[in-house]
Amino acid sequence: LVGSEMCIRDRGRLSVSKGLDTLRFVFNNQRWMYASRKNQLVNEGAVPLLLRQKHWMEVDDEKTASPVPSPDGKWIAFIKNQNIYVKEVATGKEKQLSLDGTLGNYYSAYIRWSPDSKKVASCKIRPVEKRYVYYVESSPADQLQPKLHKQEYAKPGDELPFKVPCIYEVESGRSIIPSTELFDRQYEVYGPEWNPDSRAVTFEYNQRGHQVYRVLELSAETGKVRPLVEETSDTYVNYTRHFRHDLKDGKQMIWMSERDNWNHLYMYNRITAQPDYQITKGEW
């Protein structure tokens, strides 16, 4: 089983207790617990549908998520009728923030509150028709006849979903909808995530074709988008093996890059959008 695709995919969903006597992991969409002292393996039930691992080409439509409380506990943000709403906890009064969400261009249920509880961020998503490939299982274990399977899989030239990170101020209702020229040829947009000072959000842009990858910052004050990092390649930017860690002060971040032909870590200055220094070096 160790060499199977399923096991490799789920290996990251593994945890060990502080006493090092209990191991929990996910395999084939089931939760398992191994107690080493009893040498006992227990099935703890199925993984909820929302948390199940998907094929890497399956698109998350981001339509379903729990309401999100603000850090100060005074508000709850949620999606209703494809738009962003907030509810005041003390009074139960609802307020609609976005007005332009539709079935064909809706707001993501993955809402992020600013640390100061004054703003929310979410992506506006333009979905596309899902594409599939089909394959035949010639000798299924549970029946004599072959089985036809289908797998969601976008092929070269197929249209892809388009995401626009947006910010809304709770009290004023002001919207910050950015220009998209720095992320207009999307394979994927990841984020947004709030900066510690609540003045901007950060998101990542993976350009279709994988020759450009950017870390971008959207100002909650001006609505302008600026690049913090840009990786380019004539062949391929390895987006599956990158790493970013934002430092708590909001002024620096650690970034992994292959720009010197080796995969190394850099300390980036978020203010200047330039590397302060290279953390690791060498032909390794």
Annotated model-derived regions:
Residues 4-284:
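Beta-propeller folds
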